[in-house]
């Protein structure tokens, strides 16, 4: 069931976004990211007031470490959005796709080094195969794959840091 819902979410989330952001290619990336952040904040704040426990929200701000990590993750996700929106606006959707494609590989490596997660033989084989394919693609590019690396790395580091912070989902 989870795989089916994951595929449905990917279709509804992944397909419309490049089409939507392509229509905004005349607007500066930073402005689109600022609007996305601002309106997300407004929407989530209203949602918090309507259906959540305010004390859980206030609890987040009782730890400096938690605030620090959440601030870093906010900048990482904003930078990731900027990379995605910029790549779509520059008609480099494949760079964005490749960035998100390499994210699991980067996440596995980060988990191994920072979370002491074990890499099973199948995971190791898949990382090696993916790495060889990516290196082949990178070698054949005419330019340094900055956007690909930025999108994949910023998303993976965001995931790693968010895993370090316990925030009540209510």
Per-segment meaning from a language model:
Residues 1-31, 128, 132-164:
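Glycine-/small-residue-enriched transmembrane alpha-helix faces in small-molecule transporters
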Residues 1-8, 42-71, 121, 168-170:
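Membrane-interface interhelical linkers
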Residues 11-15, 74, 78-82, 104-109, ...:
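Hydrophobic/small/kink-forming positions within alpha-helical transmembrane segments
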Residues 23-24, 32, 36, 87-88, ...:
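Hydrophobic/aromatic residues within transmembrane alpha-helices
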Residues 26-31, 82-99, 169:
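Structural motif at transmembrane-helix junctions in multi-pass transporters
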Residues 37-41, 101-105, 127-130:
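Residue-level recognition of pore/gate-forming positions within transmembrane alpha-helices
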Residues 57-94, 136:
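Specific transmembrane alpha-helical segments of multi-pass solute transporters/efflux pumps
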Residues 86, 103-123:
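C-terminal transmembrane-helix exit sites in multi-pass transporters
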